[in-house]
Amino acid sequence: MEMTNAQRLILSNQYKMMTMLDPANAERYRRLQTIIERGYGLQMRELDREFGELKEETCRTIIDIMEMYHALHVSWSNLHDQQSIDERRVTFLGFDAATEARYLGYVRFMVNVEGRYTHFDAGTHGFNAQTPMWEKYQRMLNVWHACPRQYHLSANEINQIINA
């Protein structure tokens, strides 16, 4: 991340204020303040991750994925024979924290800050699927979008989607 000295000074002062305003995270803010003040290039790359960007299209796709899982669970709940499909298969797992951190961060933002999909179970890992999921979700979305009644899925349609 490239910053002028003036930008670094402003950010350093912000971290100094955050240290006073948020004592529970003071050590983290002091560390970031030191990195900014001294211009440690390698560590400043951490800020690139924190100040990253998700394009609108990506955000909409993630919401679409979450909506698909909502539809899967609602449809599963309405099945006469729920035993044929394990409920865990229609439960949203999230994204991989190691390789899909920005997607995972957006999911957490949507649930914890925006208050959407609060009925989703974050599990003990907070929507960290611990395996890359993006490509799997894309295949699932393609099948789901082809279904004529996306919120009234049959057991066969649910199986086609989750096995995509």
Swiss-Prot record:
Organism per entry: Escherichia coli O127:H6 (strain E2348/69 / EPEC)
Protein name per its UniProtKB record: UPF0304 protein YfbU
Annotated InterPro entries: UPF0304_YfbU, YfbU_alpha-helical_sf, YfbU_helix-hairpin_sf
Sequence similarity: Belongs to the UPF0304 family.
A Pfam entry, by short name: YfbU
